């Protein structure tokens, strides 16, 4: 996929770049796999803002994605590669031989007409899903389960993948996209290959309005606020001292730089071999 840069005809197009849609083969989604999305604007059921900087944006339908890939030993044909407004990756429409249709995350080099399958022992090819115990060491995998049967949770965004580094006993060792090395049960499933649309990270929005189309509202710096609105607000000029403003903080008073916030008693801590920030 190539990045399209626009001519600087207007200030908004001067720095804008767009994803190429060369790999997209179908413009209208599969109607049976769509559900409406209820807008929240970042508010919870009491009407209070719980997620800041959300609101507006273009209307969307949610595409139901098969993250579990649990339709074993039933071959499927890739019918189309589609755009999904809800994620950075492309999605692939599968037509199973028994007539069922499902969406999956589209890995790199998956093409219309390819045949893919899920199961305990299927071919080692891009798009096939199987337990980690049957995947060769050194393979690139995506859509990885952390709990058996729950569905993929790791490496699902554009260009993401993890590397199967080792297997020992009941656990496989994975190098995550963040650099973290952790253990996962060998019965957990993963899909062979790397998620496509890797150039997504190089896209420049070019103007504020494009963020608004995506449902992202403006962010105001804490230092630009009043003391009533933020722990870092107030003071004469660009003041950082006094009133709890000496150290950067979150809007709720939590130290923002360097403070470890992970619960030390979390059960999955023992499965992390090396943290993502370890040297």
Swiss-Prot record:
Task: Name residues in a coiled coil.
Answer: none
Is the tRNA processing keyword given for this protein?
no
- Stretches with biased composition (Gly residues): 232-242
Q: What keywords is this UniProt entry annotated with?
A: Ribonucleoprotein, Ribosomal protein, RNA-binding, rRNA-binding
Give the start-end ranges of region Disordered: 223-279
The cross-references to InterPro entries, in alphabetical order and at most eight, read: NA-bd_OB-fold, Rib_uL2_dom2, Ribosomal_uL2, Ribosomal_uL2_bac/org-type, Ribosomal_uL2_C, Ribosomal_uL2_dom3, Ribosomal_uL2_RNA-bd_dom, Translation_prot_SH3-like_sf
Q: For this protein, what is any one GO molecular function term?
A: rRNA binding
What pairs make up the disulfide bonds?
none
Keyword S-adenosyl-L-methionine attached: no
User: So where does this one cross the membrane?
Assistant: none
In terms of NCBIfam families, this protein maps to: rplB_bact
Give the protein name, as stated in the record.
Large ribosomal subunit protein uL2
- Species assigned in the record: Chlorobaculum tepidum (strain ATCC 49652 / DSM 12025 / NBRC 103806 / TLS)
Gene (name only): rplB
